[in-house]
Structure formats: C-alpha cells, structure tokens
C-alpha cells in the first residue's frame, strides 16, 4: 500500500462508521461508501462530497481496501457472501478490514473463504466510542497476519492506535472481553453510587473520589456524570450492541471450557435491561433498572 493512497470502499456509515470514514476522507484517501439505509448514505455523501456506491459489487470493483463496520457478523456474512454480496467482485490482492464487533469463529471462516479468492481479511474492531471515532483516537485491536496488518497500518493509524492481538479472530475476541470488563465496571459503579446516595453522599462527590482512587474506570471517568447523573443517556452505543458483545464473550468462554459465573451474571443483567428498556435504549440507561430495583434516583437534569 505504498505510494499512492489505496482506494477505500467503506461499508456502514452509522454512528461509528460515519466519523471513521470522515477521518479517512480528511486524510486524503479516495473513498466510496455503501450503506443499506439510503437516507443515511445520501446524507453522508452530501456532507463529504462523495458518490455513494449503488451496490456492494460496484464498491468492491473499484476498491483496493474494503472496511466493514456493521451491527453483527450475520450482516457481515450477507455483505460478503449474500445474494447481493461483494465477494465475487473483490479484486484478487485486495484487503478486507473487518471492524465490526464480530464473532471470532465466524471471522475465521470469512477469512478462509476469501483466501480462496486471493483476498485477505483480518479483524480490527475498535473501542473508544463516537467521540474518539470523530477525532481518530480509537483503540484498534487487530487480529491476523502481522504482514497484512503492517501493510494496512497507514489507514489504521488515521483511525486510532493499533494493538496487534495475534491470529485472525483474536481482535474480535479481545473486543468482546474488553466490553465484558467495561460493562461489569459500569454495573458495579452504579450500584456503588446508589448505595452511597442512600447513605447520604452526593453522587457527584462519589464520582470525583472514585476518579482519584483505585475505583476509577472508564465509566467513572467518561459515563457517570456525562450520561447518567445528567440524565441524558445518549452515549451513542445501544443496549442491544452491549448484549451482543457480552454474548460473544460468554460464547468464547463456553467454547474454551471456561466456567465464568460472573460473566454469565453480567450478561444476564444487561439482557434483562435490554428486555425492559428496549434494544435501542442507550446502554447507559441500564442505570435506570438499577435505580428501579433500589427505589432511588441518582442525578437530575441540569437546570435550563
């Protein structure tokens, strides 16, 4: 990928994909995009002055590198191998960077299927949310052959910092396990705020203390005041996506004969919130369920 910048075909300009694709356009990469939501695709194309691809096959034919960032592995399979998929039109020697939070075993299968066509696929899911997607400061967990990752590094570096995780599928495994840790930290942190509030400590004070103490985590730093205590619940990451990632993490445990009772409990709590609050509720709204169970509300909307 040395010399002229490779042409990129970007599949999925949703909450995460749109700012990531925008970063690549700003960096000077020739980029075409496809999204199955025509209105969303048209809005992105108009904002960034690009022509949307009419079909996945059209996108594949004119791209050196394909980036997919989609809701789940089933949709990735449809994009690649479905009746309207792009696999048959991918150029030999092209690369697919699979940035969905996907199922590792399916990612391995996708890679093997495309290898027979002379196409490389490796997984590179991201962490950091929409704010860091906008600034190109995501954490990228890359699983695959190191030579393939190295060749794509100029593209990946536009989007964030890359940590190679090992063989194909390990990036997706690491993403799911990261969200397992993150989701557990969120739940226990909210319970601590509820307990402390009932005792008489101001929630904002508790967050301040946690952030300079050993209880600090991503949720105490970037979620509790911003989305829960403010009552905004609009981080941009939906409840069903969290449940999906936790299901993947638990599946990895089961496939590897690991007894993981806390992971199982964590996943069940989030699945319960998903059932009660709805799959499109923001994941930070899980705090509402904890509040309902305790009979107390923490935080309040800012005064207008």
Model-inferred region functions:
Residues 39, 56-61, 65-66, 70-138:
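Rossmann-like NAD(P)(H) cofactor-binding subdomain of soluble oxidoreductases
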Residues 1-69, 94, 163:
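NAD(P)+-binding Rossmann beta1-loop-alpha1 motif at the extreme N-terminus of oxidoreductases
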Residues 31, 52, 120-122, 163, ...:
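Hydrophobic beta-strand scaffold residues
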Residues 168, 172, 222-284, 290, ...:
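Interdomain hinge/lid region at the active-site interface
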Residues 135, 140-143, 163, 168-199, ...:
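Active-site-proximal catalytic alpha-helix in oxidoreductases
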Residues 8, 101-180:
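Rossmann-fold dinucleotide-binding core
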């Amino acid at each position: 990928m040395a010399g002229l910048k490779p042409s990129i075909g970007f599949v999925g300009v949703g909450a995460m994909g749109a700012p990531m694709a925008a970063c690549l356009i700003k960096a000077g990469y020739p980029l075409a995009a496809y999204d199955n939501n025509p209105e969303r695709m048209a809005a992105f194309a108009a904002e960034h002055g690009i022509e949307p691809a009419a079909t996945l096959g059209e996108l594949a034919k004119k791209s050196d590198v394909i980036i997919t960032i989609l809701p789940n592995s089933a949709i990735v399979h449809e994009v690649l191998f479905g009746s309207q998929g792009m696999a048959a039109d991918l150029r030999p020697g092209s690369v697919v960077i699979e940035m969905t939070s996907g199922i590792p075993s399916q990612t391995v299968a996708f890679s093997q299927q495309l290898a027979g066509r002379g196409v490389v696929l490796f997984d590179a899911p991201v962490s950091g949310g929409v704010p860091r997607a906008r600034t190109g400061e995501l954490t990228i967990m890359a699983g695959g052959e190191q030579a393939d990752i190295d060749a794509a590094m100029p593209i990946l570096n536009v989007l964030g910092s890359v940590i190679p995780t090992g063989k194909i599928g390990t990036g997706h495994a690491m993403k799911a396990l990261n969200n397992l840790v993150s989701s557990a930290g969120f739940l226990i942190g909210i319970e601590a705020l509820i307990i402390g509030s009932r005792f008489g400590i101001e929630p904002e004070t508790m967050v301040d203390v946690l952030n300079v103490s050993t209880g600090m985590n991503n949720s105490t730093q970037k979620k509790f005041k911003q989305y829960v205590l403010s009552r905004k619940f609009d981080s941009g990451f939906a409840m069903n996506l969290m449940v999906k990632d936790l299901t993947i993490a638990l599946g990895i445990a089961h496939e590897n004969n690991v007894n993981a009772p806390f992971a199982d409990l964590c996943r069940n709590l989030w699945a319960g919130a998903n059932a009660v609050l709805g799959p499109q509720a923001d994941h930070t709204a899980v705090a509402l369920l904890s509040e309902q169970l305790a009979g107390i509300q923490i935080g309040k909307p800012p005064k207008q």
